[in-house]
Regions:
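Transmembrane alpha-helical segments of polytopic membrane transport and secretion proteins
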Residues: 1-56, 140-142, 323-338
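A structural signal for multi-pass alpha-helical bundles of membrane permease subunits
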Residues: 48-338
Length: 338
């Protein structure tokens, strides 16, 4: 056996460079033949393994120390009464019971957030898809328009934009002043209980650039032959959109729907700035994350805030699971026979 191994090694290495040797050794591995091993090769493999773990170690330390560790600690705090000044006191499920039975502000924050998500997300995706389709049929100047529409999604969540938005929709702002020219006096949007949620939804829809770019990339991948075949069958624009564009774009729609839904549940900065941190008027901008922040950092009820955070995590996870389950009936991927 040793004679065979040494003869194989001599055949592989005779008069060849190290690159050729490695190439032939890989070919031997793929063919299933026994590859001669040497101490030098085993040592090199060990060095490569150590180097791989070395590159992985910084991320692993960061994940354990900054993500997994705090998450597990917050899970523990969710079952305690903790206010930063005293040691956590175990209370079991009291925080969760109190949340749903004794805290009307919490129920209101859930309702407001659901309205924001269920109304704002479809409108945002519809706007993104509509603009993406327009850009898909326009070649001249499409780069400029693509950048212009995408820019709000980069700056929309910033504090400065929220300040500008608040000024625009205030009582003496340009939006209200323009409406007054046409005889419509709303008295400002920021302090109006009926209009502040539509104003927040409008701010979210204005940031449709990110899903628009993803929709545009998906539209570019649809074969034109499908539209030509639909035209031969007598399909009009609406029929082509329904029977070709939507099915071929369904996986992209699902991706954007999932991403934007999760993102909508996390609205915080704009609500905080526009309401000056109060969640007003009458709690109508007291979104879930803003109320969580107020409970944790204003009222110092860290245990209660941790319980709220985990309810949100579980709710979003359940929603994502439902979306994945229901997607089997309407999302089509390449190669599907449905």
């Amino acid at each position: 056996m040793s004679t065979t191994t040494s003869s194989t090694k001599s055949i592989v290495t005779a008069g060849k460079s190290s690159r050729d040797i490695r190439r032939e050794l890989k070919a031997l591995e793929k063919s299933g033949r026994k590859v001669p091993s040497s101490p030098a090769r085993r040592q090199r493999e060990r060095r490569e393994q150590v180097a791989g773990y070395g590159f992985l170690l910084p991320w692993l330390i960061g994940f354990l120390g900054l993500t997994l560790g705090p998450m597990l600690y917050s899970l523990y705090l969710a079952f305690t009464k903790y206010n930063l000044f005293k040691d956590p006191e175990w209370v079991g499920l009291d925080n969760f019971v109190r949340m749903f039975t004794e805290d009307p502000n919490y129920i209101q924050s859930v309702q407001i957030t659901l309205v924001y998500v269920l109304v704002g997300t479809p409108i945002k995706l519809a706007a993104a898809l509509g603009v993406a389709m327009l850009l898909n049929y326009r070649d001249k100047g499409s780069g400029f328009f693509r950048s212009s529409f995408y820019a709000p999604s980069l700056i929309g969540a910033s504090v400065s934009v929220a300040i500008v938005w608040r000024a625009m929709f205030s009582t003496d702002g340009p939006v209200d002043s323009t409406l007054q020219v046409f005889g419509i006096d709303l008295g400002g949007w920021v302090g109006n209980v009926a209009l502040v949620i539509p104003m927040m939804i409008l701010l979210a829809v204005w940031q449709f650039g990110a899903p628009m770019v993803i929709f545009l990339a998906g539209l570019k991948q649809i074969p034109q032959e499908l539209y030509e075949a639909a035209e031969v069958d007598g399909a009009g624009p609406f029929r082509k959109f329904k029977s070709v564009t939507i099915p071929m774009l369904s996986s992209v729609i699902f991706f954007n729907l999932l991403l934007e839904t999760v993102h909508a549940f996390q609205v915080f900065a704009s609500a905080y700035i526009i309401s000056n941190g109060s969640g007003g008027p009458a709690g109508m901008t007291n979104f879930y994350t803003l109320y969580l922040y107020k409970r944790g950092f204003a009222d110092l009820q860290m245990g209660y805030a941790s319980a709220m955070a985990w309810v949100l995590v579980i709710a979003v996870a359940i929603l994502a699971f439902i979306l994945f389950k229901t997607s089997k009936g309407w999302v089509h991927y390449a190669g599907d026979n449905r």
